[in-house]
Amino acid sequence: MKNVTDSFVSLGHWPSAGGFGFNTDILATNPINLSVVLGVLIFFGKGVLSDLLDNRKQRILNTIRNSEELREGAIEQLEKARARLRKVEMEADQYRVNGYSEIEREKLNLINSTYNTLEQLENYKNETIHFEQQRAINQVRQRVLQQALQGALGTINSCLNKELHLRTISANIGMFGSMKEIRNN
């Protein structure tokens, strides 16, 4: 106890600022206590430090493994995405080619349909023209015939008198009578 109180008393009597010196008193500098503390720390701390380093090493290795797995997964997904992209590009090219083919086919169908429609319209036009020509010809014939008949009737009426008219009627009646006899036989 005396040593403890002496150490506190000696703390109160520090020499005032004087020079720098090396203390050779082994008990005052406490190297034994320091070496014991350092020895205990090294002995017990070695295992703790080793465990800490091993845990840290395992975490780093796990992180590296996880990173590698994630990298491999990302590479695999990238390859799948590239394959899908190639497939979609091929399908797009196919649709484009088919679309152009379909457009060309539709274009040809439309041209053919339009040509057929124009041909039908031309036929209808020609039939209508022919019909109108025939109708005009028939109308002209009827007029000519009507005018000829009117002219003939006018001529006959001007030439016929009552006596000639009676003789014509008698001749026609005689002709009908002989036709009737021929039929009955």
Curated annotation (Swiss-Prot):
<keyword id="KW-0375">Hydrogen ion transport</keyword>
<dbReference type="InterPro" id="IPR002146">
    <property type="entry name" value="ATP_synth_b/b'su_bac/chlpt"/>
</dbReference>
<comment type="function">
    <text>F(1)F(0) ATP synthase produces ATP from ADP in the presence of a proton or sodium gradient. F-type ATPases consist of two structural domains, F(1) containing the extramembraneous catalytic core and F(0) containing the membrane proton channel, linked together by a central stalk and a peripheral stalk. During catalysis, ATP synthesis in the catalytic domain of F(1) is coupled via a rotary mechanism of the central stalk subunits to proton translocation.</text>
</comment>
<dbReference type="GO" id="GO:0045259">
    <property type="term" value="C:proton-transporting ATP synthase complex"/>
</dbReference>
<keyword id="KW-0472">Membrane</keyword>
<keyword id="KW-0793">Thylakoid</keyword>
<dbReference type="GO" id="GO:0046933">
    <property type="term" value="F:proton-transporting ATP synthase activity, rotational mechanism"/>
</dbReference>
<keyword id="KW-0406">Ion transport</keyword>
<dbReference type="Pfam" id="PF00430">
    <property type="entry name" value="ATP-synt_B"/>
</dbReference>
<dbReference type="GO" id="GO:0009535">
    <property type="term" value="C:chloroplast thylakoid membrane"/>
</dbReference>
<comment type="function">
    <text>Component of the F(0) channel, it forms part of the peripheral stalk, linking F(1) to F(0).</text>
</comment>
<keyword id="KW-0066">ATP synthesis</keyword>
<comment type="subunit">
    <text>F-type ATPases have 2 components, F(1) - the catalytic core - and F(0) - the membrane proton channel. F(1) has five subunits: alpha(3), beta(3), gamma(1), delta(1), epsilon(1). F(0) has four main subunits: a(1), b(1), b'(1) and c(10-14). The alpha and beta chains form an alternating ring which encloses part of the gamma chain. F(1) is attached to F(0) by a central stalk formed by the gamma and epsilon chains, while a peripheral stalk is formed by the delta, b and b' chains.</text>
</comment>
<keyword id="KW-0138">CF(0)</keyword>
<keyword id="KW-1133">Transmembrane helix</keyword>
<feature type="transmembrane region" description="Helical">
    <location>
        <begin position="27"/>
        <end position="49"/>
    </location>
</feature>
<keyword id="KW-0813">Transport</keyword>
<protein>
    <recommendedName>
        <fullName>ATP synthase subunit b, chloroplastic</fullName>
    </recommendedName>
</protein>
<keyword id="KW-0812">Transmembrane</keyword>
<keyword id="KW-0150">Chloroplast</keyword>
<comment type="similarity">
    <text>Belongs to the ATPase B chain family.</text>
</comment>
<keyword id="KW-0934">Plastid</keyword>
